[in-house]
Amino acid sequence: MNSPNQNTRPIVIALGGNALLQRGQPPEAEIQKANIHIAALAIAKIARHYPVVVTHGNGPQVGLLALQGECEKSCKPYPLDVLGAETEGMIGYLLEQELRNQLPGRDVVTLLTQIVVDRQDPAFLQPTKPIGPVYTLEQAQQLAQERGWAIAADGQGYRRVVASPEPKRIIELPTIQLLVKSGALVVCAGGGGIPVVVNEAGGLQGVEAVIDKDLAAALLAQNLQAQGLLLLTDVDGVYENWSTNYAHCFEQTTPKNLRRYRFAAGSMGPKVEAACRFVETTGQWCGIGKLDQALDIIDGKAGTVVMP
């Protein structure tokens, strides 16, 4: 088996949903394949030097599947946990294939991942997680009225938002640990993992939600004792006064400093919270920035690096 530094701790890389499907692009399979090819090139550069575990977003994809389900009148729409599992399989397959092509001889494994949430989490009463395509205000208002969706602003447009409870426990963690120890590059916890609760009989049961993939990545990185966490998105770092004339990028900062500011709940906010949690609990670093600058972020030459 060809793998780098098997005795060192991994870097956990979280790919934003926009790294897989850029804003404004139609959610077609060939377009996503092309974007995943680009993402795999960036991940492979890191994986040649470090052990790597990859997670990814699924917001556009799970939203598309939900829309398709709404259009099929012959059966009830599939619940969000099932749709999340479908996207985890699809995106994981495409990522694994591209990574195997980029890293000949390297074991690459995709693992469906269930993550326990609290059924009493207040997030179930206040949806914040954007999924699906971007709409104009007029389109969003019409869909909210027709389908009973919760809608919120996201960038220059509007998207459907769903419940996003806190990730508490990763069911497949022991298996992930074994795979990492073996030297495999693991793709797991895609889309934040499949949200489940423990029922009265002590078994697992899926719930209607989408876990934030950055918070899930932080929990995964903490549990794996990762040497670092890399949150990759379509902006080049964390900004104070974003989208104003006074915007300023934090190049190197601390959780204490970042917690002084407010960031958008559906986009940069979870990334900052994930970074702070990981750094505070482990004493390791977290980088936030653009996919094509991933190696430079690790080297402290790009993006925002959060340190203890």
Curated annotation (Swiss-Prot):
GO cellular component labels: cytosol
Protein name, entry field: Carbamate kinase
Organism from which the protein derives: Synechocystis sp. (strain ATCC 27184 / PCC 6803 / Kazusa)
Reactions catalysed, as given in the entry: hydrogencarbonate + NH4(+) + ATP = carbamoyl phosphate + ADP + H2O + H(+)
PANTHER family listed in its UniProt record: CARBAMATE KINASE, CARBAMATE KINASE-RELATED
Coiled coil: none
Biological processes, Gene Ontology terms: arginine metabolic process; proline biosynthetic process
SUPFAM superfamilies: Carbamate kinase-like (SSF53633)
